[in-house]
C-alpha cells in the first residue's frame, strides 16, 4: 500500500499541474474562438498545425523517454550515463531534423497548405525540435521524483502563453493567427532557459553500445507512440486533404477542434496518471506484489475516469460557454471523444506487460492494426460524414 500511496501523491502533483494547466489553457479556447471568427478558419489552422507538431514530437523522441526509464532503473547501466546518451541522441536528431526542414521550408509549407504563410510552419518546426529535446530533461525530473519542478516548468509555459495571448487577442484585438505560433515559440524558449540545471553538472558521454540497446528497445515503442498520437490527431491532419471543399475544410476543422477541447478533461486524467504510473511500474517491477498493485491502480483509474465522463455530460450545458457560440454546433462529438480517451488510458495501462519483459514488438503490432483502422475510416468517411467520422474513428 505504501507504493500506491506514493503513486497517488505523485499523480496528485502531476495531475494538479496538468489539470490547472489544461484549465488555464481552456482560457485560450474562448479567446481564439471569439477573436477568430468561425468563417475565417483561423482556429482550424491552429488545430491542424498543432496536430502536425504532435505527430512530429513523437517521431523526434522515438520512444526514448520510456527507454530512459527502463535502462535507468535496470540497475545494469549507470543512470547518468543513460541520461547523457539519451540526451545527446535526441538532441542530435532534433537538430538534424530542424536543419533539413528549414532548408526545404517553402516546399513543405506549400504541400501542407501554408504556402502563403511558410513562417507559420517555420516557427512550429523550431518549437517541436525544442520540445523533443526538453522531453528528456522532463523525463529525468520524473525519474528523480521531482514532480514539483516538473509541474512548475509546465505551469510557467502555460501562464506565459496565456498572458501573451490575452495581451494580443484581447488587449490589442488582434486577429493574426500566426501570432499564436510566435507566442508558443517564445514560451518554449523560456522553459528551455529555465531547464539549464538539468543540462549541466555531469559528463556528457555517448555510449554507442548502450544506445544500440536502447534503440532496439525503444523502436517498437515509437511505432506504438505513432499509433497512439494518430489516434488523437490523424483526423485533424487528414481532414483538409480529404474534405471535398478545401475552403470549408478549415472552418469545419475549427468547429471540431474547438468542441473536442471540452473532451480533453479525460486526456488530462490519463496524462496525469501516465506521468506518475510509468516510473512507478518500472521501479516496482521486481517486487512480489507488483501485479496486485498494478491491478488496483487500474481499478481506481477506471473509477475516476468514469466519474469524469459523467460529470462532463451532466454539466455540458455550462461547459459549452468555453466556446464561442458559433462553435456549439460541434458539441455532439464530446461524449464520443471522451470515451475514446478513456479507452486509450486503459490500453496504456494494459500495455506494460510487454514493456516489462522487453517484448515491445507486440505494442508495435497492436498499434499498426489500430492505426490502420483509424486512417482507413477517416479517409473513407470524412467526405461523407464530415467531422463526425473523425470522432467515431
PLM feature spans:
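Helix-loop junctions and terminal segments of transmembrane helices
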Residues: 31, 60-76, 259-299, 351-356
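Interfacial segments at transmembrane-helix termini and the short loops linking adjacent helices
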Residues: 39-40, 105-124, 250, 312-344, ...
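Interhelical loop/hinge segments that connect adjacent transmembrane helices in multipass membrane
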Residues: 1-7, 148, 178-179, 193-232, ...
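Hydrophobic alpha-helical transmembrane segments
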Residues: 118, 122, 151-200, 224, ...
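Helix-terminus/linker motif at the lipid-water interface of multi-pass membrane proteins
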Residues: 26-42, 109-110, 173, 226-265, ...
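Membrane-interface junctions at transmembrane-helix termini in multi-pass inner-membrane proteins
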Residues: 71-74, 130-153, 202, 339-369
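C-terminal transmembrane helix end/exit motif
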Residues: 7, 68, 136-143, 147, ...
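Signature of the first transmembrane helix
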Residues: 2-65, 94, 98-102, 127, ...
Amino acid at each position: 500500500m505504501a507504493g500506491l500511496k506514493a503513486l497517488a501523491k505523485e499523480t496528485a502533483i502531476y495531475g494538479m499541474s496538468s489539470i490547472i494547466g489544461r484549465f488555464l489553457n481552456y482560457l485560450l479556447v474562448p479567446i481564439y474562438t471569439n477573436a477568430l471568427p468561425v468563417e475565417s478558419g483561423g482556429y482550424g489552422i491552429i488545430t491542424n498545425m498543432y496536430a502536425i507538431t504532435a505527430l512530429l514530437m513523437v517521431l523526434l523522441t522515438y520512444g526514448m523517454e520510456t527507454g530512459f526509464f527502463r535502462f535507468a532503473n535496470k540497475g545494469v547501466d549507470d543512470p547518468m550515463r543513460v541520461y547523457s546518451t539519451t540526451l545527446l541522441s535526441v538532441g542530435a536528431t532534433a537538430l538534424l531534423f530542424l536543419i533539413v526542414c528549414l532548408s526545404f521550408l517553402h516546399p513543405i509549407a506549400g504541400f501542407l497548405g501554408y504556402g502563403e504563410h511558410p513562417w507559420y510552419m517555420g516557427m512550429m518546426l523550431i518549437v517541436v525540435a525544442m520540445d523533443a529535446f526538453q522531453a528528456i530533461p522532463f523525463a529525468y525530473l520524473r525519474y528523480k521524483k521531482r514532480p514539483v519542478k516538473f509541474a512548475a516548468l509546465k505551469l510557467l509555459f502555460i501562464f506565459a502563453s496565456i498572458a501573451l495571448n490575452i495581451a494580443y487577442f484581447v488587449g490589442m484585438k488582434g486577429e493574426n493567427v500566426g501570432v499564436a505560433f510566435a507566442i508558443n515559440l517564445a514560451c518554449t524558449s523560456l522553459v528551455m532557459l529555465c531547464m539549464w540545471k538539468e543540462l549541466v553538472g555531469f559528463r556528457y558521454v555517448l555510449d554507442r553500445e548502450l544506445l544500440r540497446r536502447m534503440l532496439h528497445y525503444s523502436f517498437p515503442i515509437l511505432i506504438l507512440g505513432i499509433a497512439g498520437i494518430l489516434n488523437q490527431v490523424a483526423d485533424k491532419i487528414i481532414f483538409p486533404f480529404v474534405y471535398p471543399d478545401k475552403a470549408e475544410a478549415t472552418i469545419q476543422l475549427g468547429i471540431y477542434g474547438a468542441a473536442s477541447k471540452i473532451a480533453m478533461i479525460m486526456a488530462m486524467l490519463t496524462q496525469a496518471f501516465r506521468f506518475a504510473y510509468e516510473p512507478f511500474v518500472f521501479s516496482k517491477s521486481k517486487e512480489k506484489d507488483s501485479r496486485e498493485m498494478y491491478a488496483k491502480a487500474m481499478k481506481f483509474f477506471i473509477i475516476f475516469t468514469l466519474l469524469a465522463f459523467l460529470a462532463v455530460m451532466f454539466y455540458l450545458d455550462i461547459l459549452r460557454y468555453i466556446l464561442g457560440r458559433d462553435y456549439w454546433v460541434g458539441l455532439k462529438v464530446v461524449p464520443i471523444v471522451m470515451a475514446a480517451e478513456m479507452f486509450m488510458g486503459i490500453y496504456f495501462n494494459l500495455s506494460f506487460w510487454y514493456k516489462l519483459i522487453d517484448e515491445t514488438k507486440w505494442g508495435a503490432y497492436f498499434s499498426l492494426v489500430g492505426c490502420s483502422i483509424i486512417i482507413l475510416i477517416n479517409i473513407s468517411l470524412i467526405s461523407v460524414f464530415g467531422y463526425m467520422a473523425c470522432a467515431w474513428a
